[in-house]
Amino acid sequence: MLDTKEKFSHLTVSLHWLVGVTIIALLAVGIYMEENEADALYLIHKSIGVLIFIAVLWRVIWRVRNGWPKPAGNYKKVERVLSKITHWILIIGTVLMPVSGMLMSGAGGHGFGIFGLELVAMNPDPLNPEEMIPLNQSLAELGHILHGAGGNLMILAILLHILGAFKHHLVDKDGTLRRMLGADIGR
């Protein structure tokens, strides 16, 4: 089933919440890891990041195939533009965050995988195995910059998205949030 103005498909709703909740959790864990040097969380963070990338690609393909959802109501032009910008940041960000993380980790010599299944091997220094030798320092730095800046931009876009959802639900009372929870707002 494709999305309609009144109802989103189960796939759209499921992918929205799976990707949204997971990205929020990964952002929170990422901030915690950075601020607390919680090295034990890197394996989990990277593994879930790689796995969610699969769902993100599925979601992007589904969105392209299905098209953008029609608004549940009539809104001012500024609201429509802000909504489009926010949604594009979220879509691009959900692709950019896993890609930049894999680039940072892989090119930085730290490798990554899925819960012990190595996808890109670590590159330890033979003289000091605790230290990693970057495979490409420039790409690792680019990944690091994109991951950090992308994370900050994603947090802002997520907050705008959540505020918009509450505005639709509490002020406009237009069914947008109920539709994303799976309801048919045409009934």
Task: Describe the role of every protein-language-model region.
Residues 1-187:
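Membrane-embedded alpha-helical bundles that constitute the cytochrome b-like, heme-associated redox core
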